[in-house]
Amino acid sequence: MIMKITLMSYNTQHCLNYVTRKIDFDIMADTIKRCGADIIGFQEMRDQSQDPAYEAQAKIIAEKLGYHYYYFAEAIRFAGVNPYGNALISRYPILSAETVRIPDPDPRKYDGYYETRCLLKATIDVGSGLHVLVSHFGLNPDEQENAVETVVSHIPADRCVLMGDFNMKPDNPILQPVMQKLCDTAQYFPSPKLSFPSDSPRVKIDYIFVSSDVNVCCADIPEIVSSDHRPHVVTIEWE
């Protein structure tokens, strides 16, 4: 039997409505519905804490979609208590999920902003199984090198999707080890697309990669202004 599903990568800027500058779960859920996504990998998501501004954002959006499966991968705790990281929401059961820490550069080589990052690694119960990786890379080259090394070491042998905001343009040589292992679905765009900022994008830093044993039916970055990033969407199929 051929399985066909739609995946979406989305940096939500902690579910901040780009126009109103307020937390807006409805517009995030509506964006997912408009894209018809079955599995969504998020970056810049909050989770529950004592601070009322920190809610279980993946759970809230999943409930608005009527999806029953979600996972939050904590990368950092702001102020030591407020969890922040990546998340996954799925129409299909999540068989397993784990949070893999990306090592911080030590020592730091640059003067820019540094932040601890992580890789969300999950297996979804769809068809014969699908491995999904979600990450948000740092801004500095040494952070990005550590992220690429971590991701490449966790790419499984079959049926894999890697998605996220990698803070790198496609021609960045640091990204090449990923390009060599997986297929960049941007080649299936109907025309070249950029992803950030959402109202007038100047760069493409958001990605969905797939392994060679899945077929890409279509891919796009829709012109949607909800978060500060546009969503990246791909439909794949496999037997």
Mark where each language-model region is.
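Glycine-rich loop at the start of a catalytic domain that most often binds anionic cofactors/ligands
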Residues: 54-55, 88
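Active-site neighborhood of divalent metal-dependent phosphoester/pyrophosphate hydrolases
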Residues: 43-50
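Phosphate-coordination/substrate-recognition cap region in phosphate-metabolizing enzymes
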Residues: 57-61
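Active-site regions of metal-assisted phosphoester/phosphodiester hydrolases
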Residues: 1-39, 63-64, 69-73, 79-239
